[in-house]
Amino acid sequence: MEAGKISTRYARAIYEYALEQGNETILYKGMQSLAKHFAMYPVLKKSINDPTLSDENKIKLLIAACRIDSNKTLKQAIKVIVKNGRAYYIERIARMYEKEYRQSKGLVLAQLTTVGLTTNNEAKKLLIKFLSNKTNGQIEFKTILNLDIIGGFILEIEDLLLDASVKRQLNQIKCQI
């Protein structure tokens, strides 16, 4: 079975189980933390895929990465994934769970990447209001600081990308020359 199907099926099953338990939001935060830790620490993926590491240690490591250690539903979901030999897919499962949660709750993920921290709260509020009117959903808004874009901004809304960065414009000029 391909990785996408496995991840999607597990994510949906975990979401439905969490929904029954009334813990879907707690699991969402745990899965966000887990996905973030996989992105920040590549050694985490290596550790999870290490055949010499016992299942119990993998479970403990994943629960620690979620930063929500007292939730029974989260522990149970991680145990099922690891015990079924699907630890290799856990990063994808976490990302698919996030997607499943946002879809069911009507949340739209918007991410603004700038060179400097956006301190203008009024501009953020206007942008969130504009996006929520256009998407007919609630906006989950994140700002990211990235000095590599030189100037301007990059706005990502779900699968749409608006790249108004100086770096992209310089690359376009470079390609034309």
From Swiss-Prot:
InterPro entries, A to Z: ATP_synth_OSCP/delta_N_sf (IPR026015), ATPase_OSCP/d_CS (IPR020781), ATPase_OSCP/dsu (IPR000711)
Membrane-topology descriptor: Peripheral membrane protein
Origin superkingdom: Bacteria
Record keywords: ATP synthesis, Cell inner membrane, Cell membrane, CF(1), Hydrogen ion transport, Ion transport, Membrane, Transport
Subunit structure: F-type ATPases have 2 components, F(1) - the catalytic core - and F(0) - the membrane proton channel. F(1) has five subunits: alpha(3), beta(3), gamma(1), delta(1), epsilon(1). F(0) has three main subunits: a(1), b(2) and c(10-14). The alpha and beta chains form an alternating ring which encloses part of the gamma chain. F(1) is attached to F(0) by a central stalk formed by the gamma and epsilon chains, while a peripheral stalk is formed by the delta and b chains.
PANTHER family: ATP SYNTHASE DELTA CHAIN
Function comment: F(1)F(0) ATP synthase produces ATP from ADP in the presence of a proton or sodium gradient. F-type ATPases consist of two structural domains, F(1) containing the extramembraneous catalytic core and F(0) containing the membrane proton channel, linked together by a central stalk and a peripheral stalk. During catalysis, ATP synthesis in the catalytic domain of F(1) is coupled via a rotary mechanism of the central stalk subunits to proton translocation. This protein is part of the stalk that links CF(0) to CF(1). It either transmits conformational changes from CF(0) to CF(1) or is implicated in proton conduction.
Protein name, per record: ATP synthase subunit delta
Organism: Azobacteroides pseudotrichonymphae genomovar. CFP2
Lineage: Bacteria, Pseudomonadati, Bacteroidota, Bacteroidia, Bacteroidales
